[in-house]
């Protein structure tokens, strides 16, 4: 029988994130610190708007690109937060989560064999999306000594005449790294000089703890070269509503909308009405959640310091990325033993690329109470490993 599976699909490996949670779900008294999902409920006023839209019978398709009201609020939000002006008619597309936006942006822009530069460690979807778009993914291995930021030198050294697109995943999952304005200005200079485009994944833009997030699209000469990706899952605790958006040059958004039209039709109508409310009246909710995340972040950093576990200070998202190289085992081995012996699930850094070897992703999108119990178990485990090394 003929093989029914496409080669490029068979080439893609399943996400390394899920492995440990299939185990932990069956384990009594286990704690998971691995899922990148807010532990907060969607704020009630946002839920109410979704409920109200259902009660009013707003259950039909929207336009392919999304509700006019939502696209206008997205433009207002980006103008208010980043000082960027977009035309809601031609430069905004509402998608089923930020993940869909990443996928269709690559498919709309990349010709077979063109290169997509992907800094790693980073979100697991970028490389598979590039492969499915018939692109050649080129990995830029970020360094711990640079706090996992992308440098202009690393970018310049990687660009070839086949390079079309740079993925810029900051604030970063899994490291929590951010790019400050000066970093972005140096990157932008290379982008313009080399005449390539940027896919800027800014899904964690509201979750920064060292000043306001800066979008590369806000820098001179960059809006016309940037596809800005964002959404509602992380900032507004709306993961299950599955809603994101892309903003960028009209000719790119037009082609993305074409793919979206044939594959999806439109994003969920109920979710779109709820998102309008989130953008209009959700600032205080975001502030409260960000304050709670920051408290947890500080707790973890202090705990790592006390147990002598090396970890650079992350200023974005809701992850820490401690180094476990001192123990002489791989990230996967450490995570496996930690789960088996202490019943705590974390994610090996290698789930996010080879440069994540020797690190773990720990999410603090969990209650402080859970974090305290988990850190107690981590300290016990670390002390056990150090005792083993002395024998």
PLM features: what roles do these ranges have?
Residues 2-5, 10-13, 23-27, 31, ...:
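PLP-dependent class I/II
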């Amino acid at each position: 029988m003929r093989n029914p599976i496409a080669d490029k699909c068979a080439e893609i490996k399943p996400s390394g994130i899920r492995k440990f949670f299939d185990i932990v779900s069956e384990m009594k008294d286990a704690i998971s610190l691995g899922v990148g999902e807010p532990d907060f409920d969607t704020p009630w006023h946002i839920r109410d708007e979704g409920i109200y839209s259902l009660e009013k019978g707003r259950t039909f398709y929207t336009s392919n690109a999304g509700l006019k009201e939502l696209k206008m609020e997205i433009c207002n939000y980006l103008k208010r937060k980043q000082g960027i002006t977009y035309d809601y008619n031609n430069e905004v597309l509402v998608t089923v989560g930020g993940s869909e936006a990443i996928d269709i942006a690559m498919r709309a822009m990349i010709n077979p064999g063109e290169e997509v530069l992907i800094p790693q460690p980073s979100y697991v979807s970028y490389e598979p999306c590039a492969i499915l778009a018939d692109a050649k993914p080129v990995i830029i291995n970020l360094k711990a000594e640079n706090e996992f930021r992308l440098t202009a030198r690393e970018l310049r050294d990687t660009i070839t005449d086949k390079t079309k697109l740079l993925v810029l995943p900051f604030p970063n999952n899994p490291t929590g790294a951010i790019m400050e304005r000066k970093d972005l200005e140096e990157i932008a200079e290379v982008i313009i000089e080399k005449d390539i485009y940027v896919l800027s994944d800014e899904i964690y833009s509201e979750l920064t703890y060292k000043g306001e997030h800066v979008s590369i699209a806000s820098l001179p000469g960059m809006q016309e070269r940037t596809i800005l990706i964002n959404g509602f899952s992380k900032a507004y605790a709306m993961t299950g509503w599955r809603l994101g958006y892309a903003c960028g040059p009209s000719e790119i958004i037009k082609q993305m909308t074409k793919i979206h039209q044939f594959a999806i039709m439109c994003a969920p109508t109920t979710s779109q009405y709820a998102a309008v409310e989130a953008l209009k009246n959700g600032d205080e909710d975001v502030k409260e959640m960000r304050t709670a995340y920051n408290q947890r972040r500080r707790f973890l950093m202090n705990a790592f310091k006390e147990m002598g576990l090396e970890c650079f200070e992350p200023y974005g998202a809701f992850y820490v990325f401690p180094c476990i190289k001192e123990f002489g085992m791989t990230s996967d081995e450490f995570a496996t033993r930690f789960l088996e012996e202490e019943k705590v699930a974390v994610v090996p850094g290698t789930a996010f690329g080879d440069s994540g070897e020797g690190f773990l992703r720990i999410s603090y999108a969990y209650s402080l109470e859970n974090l305290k119990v988990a850190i107690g178990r981590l300290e016990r485990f670390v002390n056990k490993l150090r005792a083993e090394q002395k024998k």
